Amino acid sequence: MDLNGKCVLLGVSGGIAAYKMANVASALRKLGADVEVIMTKNATQFITPVTFETLTGHKCMVDTFDRDFKFEVTHISLAKKADVILVAPATANVIAKMAHGIADDMLTTTVLAAKCPKLVSPAMNTGMLENPITQDNIATLERYGFTVIPSESGVLACKDVGSGRLPKEDVLIEHILHAIARPKDLAGLCIAVTAGPTQEPLDPVRYLTNHSTGKMGYALARAAAMRGADVTLIHGETALQPVKFTTDVPVTTAQQMYEAVTSRFDATDVLIMAAAVADYRPAAVANDKIKKKDGDMSIPLERTPDILGTIGPKKTHQFLCGFSMETRDLVENSSAKLTKKNLDMVVANNLKVAGAGFGVDTNVVTLITPDGTRELPLMSKADVADAILDEILKRRSQ
């Protein structure tokens, strides 16, 4: 996901975290963004304009009446040029000014003139942040359509421990991506995505599971959220970071995933079952650890609930997309699932194909619908996710 052709305006005010914005500016440039920076006068006490000018290739604006550049009404031109504005760190002072329409410097004047999405990341001492006046000002900004990025907690520069830290750079960048990286063509849709493995306990120590890492499902959830959908991510145990802008529903067993999916199904417009749900579980779970003995041991297994098999025949308006992992007869086996479970689409992949399957960042899939099949080339899982969502959007509009 990139920001080619997008202009990001960073507003840096006078907080100790101002230095972090150099990393943000650099990362945004690597994503292809055109980055402009406006600093308050106090911000220049923490980091110099030259740093931002070197990283962005643009003059860093501070003084509204600076004449050392080609004439134009700069606070208006930047307000029109920006696709998104991020004010970070946003001090209590700057937040108060923006909340009350005070435009007494280049930053606040530009923010007031801009009509693009505006993000604000408060960063200050805990006492200042929690002061009712600051909280009222933050609420006012939200009421006017600003997106407020919550502060993080930890040890502050003043050695206090509490909320008020500027979020990590990747969090700020993710908010920018969410605001402008993709058209919001999935806005208004409630999409549920399942991801990762399930774990079926044998005793308090052991369980049956599979090799799924959840990467494909997480990529789908992130892509859908970036495109404006209301996303619920129902997932088994993974080592992946939570997907921002989604409702996170962790589960462990196939039974829990069944309950999580079916309880939300009526309110769901699109269900994408990317999870590797166990087909079988131990028929009985031992209360104590099973001790090793001489000889072999057999474990009786029983079927787990078939999630798509249960809800497929009951669907009304929902679009159902299943996943099929095969090692042979890919299209034949996956097409049978499409018909048997009353699905709208099956995403099939062959574990034996190089670059596909578990634990890698790429995939090779075949999209199977009632109209036929379409094999996609080797792509990143992020690109595969967008291709799947494109197909779903197209078929829902038919």
Residue spans for each PLM region:
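A cross-family phosphate/adenosyl-ligand binding-site feature
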Residues: M1-L119, N125-Q398
